[in-house]
Structure formats: C-alpha cells, structure tokens
Amino acid sequence: MKTYVIGDIHGCLTSLKTVLENTPITAQDRLIFVGDYVDRGPDSKGVIDYLLQVQQEYSCEFLMGNHEEKFLLSRVYDFEIKEWYGFWDAQATMDSYGTDDIEQIPESHWEFLRKLCLFIEDERFIYVHATLEPDVELQRQQSHTLIHQKLKDPQPHCSGKIVICGHTAQKNHLPLDKGHTLCIDTDAGRDGWVTCLCTNTGTYWQANEQAEYRQGVISSLSREHNQCETVSNET
C-alpha cells in the first residue's frame, strides 16, 4: 500500500481529474487530501461531486482547509457570508452551483464538509492543511494554526515526524521541500497546478486546467526511499 497526498484544488476539476487519472494509484492505496477544495477555480461543485465519487473507489481521508471552514460558517452567520463573498472568491463557488442561495447546495456536500479532519497522523508523517507550532504536541495545536496560519519559517515538529501541508501557495508552482516540512500547495486556482505526492517514493505528479501533466521528485523523500531500498537489499 502506498500513500498519495493531494494538495490544494480550489475548484480546479480538470486539474484534479487529470492528475489522479495519470497517477499510478491502485485500489489498495490510500489518498489524503489537504483541503481547500472550493473557491477561485471554475467548478467547486464538480470537485466535491468528484471527491464523493473517488471515496467510493479508494481509501480516502480529507482535511479541512480555511476555505471549507468559511464555506460552512457562511451557512450560519450573515457576517461570514459577506466576508466569504468579499475576500474569499465565493462567487466562483456559488456560480458552480448555479445559485446564489446557499440553502440550495446539496445536503451531501454539507455532510462532506462537516466530516473534514483537522489533522491526520501516521508513523512517519503529520498531515495538516496549514502548519503546526513546532513545540506543541499535535493534540494541543490550535485549530487556527492548523487551518489558517501561513508557512513562514517552518521548523521541525517536536514529534520528529515530517509535516505535509498545503495552504501557503508556492508561486513557482513546485512543492516546497524543507526536509522536515513539505508544502504541496502549488497555486491551483491562480493558473497553478494541482499536486499529488507519493510519500513512499517522493515522486509527485501535477496537472493544470489546460490538462497539461508533468512529474518530479521531492529529493528528501526520494533519498530516504533509496536508503530504505538499499538496506532491504542488503538484508
């Protein structure tokens, strides 16, 4: 089983479909999505519809991004929906639903949004949307840090695990590799790319809204993978 982590999507359905269809994912593999499925891009509704379909075919886990949090809050508070429209590119999302009435959004989409996680952890990695406070245990992290805080000068987390996140757009459209921290927000929704990273090998795949497709390697994960293979072959 391999783990594939998908970065920020922002309504870019063509990018998402292209990257997943060209990545060698099998039914035994695990998919983790780091959040920001909606806003900016042309088809937020289509993205959520597609994710609901994908989770029927694969083992999927979904993190909450700041855009999903704002989406949920906008259903409850008038001031939140005004801010969502004013600063968060909500119009693109509502246009994809073909309505300006938030209550017309399918209940299955609200259920999907309500079930999103704040963090995911396994033996080697911690997955969050935004970032972590380096000296704070995972269970004690503030939700604002996990969902909203920008990645400025990331430091190793006290757990010793590698942190994989999105949220802070990489304007060169390539994943950020700090060794202890990997950011795979490659600016989807602003003429960037959706990134899918295999944590087992360090290989990543990217696609954009023109259905262009490319791949690369995160060197820190690739070195670790090669070292593990060498040890395995020696034994």
Predicted regions and their residues:
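N-terminal active-site segment of His-dependent metallophosphoesterases
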Residues: 1-48
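Beta-strand-turn-beta hairpins that frame and shape the catalytic cleft
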Residues: 1-4, 120-126, 178
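Residue-level marker for buried hydrophobic side chains located in beta-strands
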Residues: 5, 31-33, 62-63, 126, ...
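Active-site environment of divalent metal-dependent phosphoester hydrolases
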Residues: 10-14, 39-42, 69-72, 134-135, ...
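Active-site neighborhood of divalent metal-dependent phosphoester bond hydrolases
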Residues: 40-48, 52-118, 149
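Acidic, His/Gly-rich catalytic cores of divalent-metal-dependent hydrolytic chemistry
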Residues: 155-235
